[in-house]
Amino acid sequence: MAADLPAAAAPPASGRVFPGAAVQVREARRFLAGVLDGCPAGDDALLCASELATNAVLYSRSGRPGGRFAVRSAVRAGRVRVEVEDEGGPWRPGGEQNGQNGQNGQNGQSGQSGRGLVIVGQRASRWGRDDHGDRRTVWFEIDC
């Protein structure tokens, strides 16, 4: 006999682990596109997720040979939350943390470098960074 789920049951979170190579950022984006189908803010969420996955590959041990990064997402109560977990390491893009964009883009970086978290800060309702052991999770939330 199947148990009845309450009407307000939240959908489960989705997640996947990717090899730490630049080409895998596109695969992470494709994965999330399927999860976020129907979310009006899906394009913004995909852009932000791409920026975080790129940072994981470029600025953490995830980008080294054999490295990996994970992408998790959940859509609940009109809000999407996306997390990108990397293998830690030096944190170079501008010193941003916990929703404060700091000096990103003004710290001597040129060209396209260092702008990813500024984009996340502009598009997301909230974002932050959590360090846990030798791993780091950067997350954002966007209202759908």
Roles of regions detected by a PLM:
Residues 27-50, 98-105, 111:
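Conserved short strand/loop->alpha-helix "switch" segment adjacent to the catalytic nucleotide/phosphoryl-transfer site
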Residues 15-25:
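STAS-typified acidic loop motif
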Residues 44-62:
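Histidine-centered phosphotransfer motif of kinases
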Residues 1-15, 57-144:
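Conserved beta-strand-loop-beta-strand hairpin that lines the nucleotide-binding pocket
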